[in-house]
Amino acid sequence: MILLILSGGKSRRMGCDKLLLTRPDGIRQIDWLAGLAKATGCEVMLSRRDDSSPPVDLPVIADLHPGGGPLAALAAAHAARPDQPVLMLGGDLFLLDAATLKHLLDHRDPARRATAFANRIDGRPEPHCAIYEVSGSSLAAGWLARGDFHARHFLESLEPRVLDLPQPAALDGANTPHELAECFAKLERGVRLKTLIVRYSRSLHEVLGQEEEQIETLACTVAGLYEELRFRNRLDIRTDDLQANRDGRPLAWDEILVRDEVIDFTLKGGV
C-alpha cells in the first residue's frame, strides 16, 4: 500500500505552506506526518503539483493534472502504482495520531472501493484520511477528465466503508491562521468536551432560526467554536464579518473558551 502525503505548496488562506509550519512541540508538520506514515509500514510518498524539490526526503509523485487538488494526487498515485491501494493523508492534519491511522488500517475493507472516517460534525466521509482501493483510485482520472475535482463527492460515489473516529478531533484541519490556533490549542491543552450557551444577534437569528442554543463542543478557542457552528449550519459568513462577545466584552478569535460560559455572536454593522 502507498501512503501518500498531500503537499501543494503555498496555501492561499494560510499564506504559507502548511507542511512547513512548526508545531507546538518544535517539529515541522511534514516531519511529524512523515514519522507517522513511516511507522505504518506503508510505502510513503509525497504528492507535489510539480517536480519541485520536496521539503523532506521522500519519493515524489507529481500531479498529472495540475490544479486538480487531491483527486489529481490520487490519479497520479494510481498511474504510478496501478496495482497498489492508496492511503491518502492531508497535509494539514495537525491532530492526527498513530492510533487513528492504526484504526483505519485495522478496519480497512478491501471488498469496498474505499474505507474512510466519518466527519465528526456532519457524518460524511473524510477524503483526506482514507484508503482508496485500486477499484476506487482507478476512477479518479475519469472525474478529472470531466472537470469534477470534488474529493468528498468522489469518495461518496465509491460507497466506502465509513468508520467512527476513535479520537473525535483527530481529523480537524487548519486552512486559516485562526483554525491553526485552534489546532495548536487542542495540542497544548487537550481535547475535552464542554457545554456552552451561544446567543445570536437579530441578524444571525434570522439566518439560523433561533436566538440561543446550548451546545456541546470540542473547541478550545472562539474561532474553533464558530468553525463548528459554521460547518454544522453551512454558514457563508466569515469571521471578518462577525464579533464574538463575553459579558459584553469583545473577544479575540484565539481567546480560550471556558466551560458553561455564554458567548454572543453579532454581525459587524448589524444588530
Predicted feature residues:
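Glycine-rich phosphate/pyrophosphate-binding loop and the adjoining helix
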Residues: 168-191
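Ubiquitin-like/PB1-type beta-grasp interaction modules and other compact soluble beta-rich domains
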Residues: 188-271
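Short, charged, surface-exposed loops that flank catalytic or proteolytic processing sites
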Residues: 146-150, 221-224
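Nucleotide and nucleotide-moiety/phosphate-recognizing core
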Residues: 1-135, 141-148, 156-170, 178, ...
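Residues that scaffold the ATP/ADP-binding catalytic core of kinase and kinase-like folds
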Residues: 23, 139-140, 183, 207
